[in-house]
Every structure is written in C-alpha cells, then in structure tokens.
C-alpha cells in the first residue's frame, strides 16, 4: 500500500514535491536536498503529511 507525502522547503516552507511512499517504511520522515523554485537554490526538503 502506498501513501502520499509532500516535501516542503525548510527555508521558505513552500510545498514543491510529492512522493508515493510505502506505508510499511514509516520510521522517520524523509529529508532530501532538492531545488526550490521559490528560493531559487537547492535546499533541504522535509516530508509533510
């Protein structure tokens, strides 16, 4: 079973990406360094629910 999760920028707080994650692997939230269109640079994005 998959669950939808959004990725929010830690700098500006905008939600830029969505992921389909396995509901089994739910230990901790995902943190990925991705490009933020609002900030205009690569920043850390954390999972939101």
From Swiss-Prot:
Which InterPro entries does this chain map to? Ribosomal_bL33 (IPR001705), Ribosomal_bL33_sf (IPR038584), Ribosomal_zn-bd (IPR011332)
Instruction: Please name the SUPFAM superfamilies in this protein's record.
Output: Zn-binding ribosomal proteins
**Pfam family for this entry, one:** Ribosomal_L33
A GO cellular component term found in this entry reads: ribosome
Q: Which residues form a coiled coil?
A: none
A Gene Ontology biological process noted in the UniProt record is: translation
NCBIfam families, alphabetically?
PRK00504.1 (NF001764), rpmG_bact (TIGR01023)
Family, similarity comment: Belongs to the bacterial ribosomal protein bL33 family.
Instruction: Please state what the protein is called.
Output: Large ribosomal subunit protein bL33C
- Which organism was this protein described from? Lactococcus lactis subsp. cremoris (strain MG1363)
Gene designation per UniProt: rpmG3
């Amino acid at each position: 079973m998959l669950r939808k999760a959004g990725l929010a920028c830690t700098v500006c707080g905008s939600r830029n990406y969505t992921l389909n994650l396995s509901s089994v692997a739910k230990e901790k939230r995902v943190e990925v360094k991705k490009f933020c269109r609002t900030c205009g640079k690569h920043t850390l994005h954390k999972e939101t629910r």
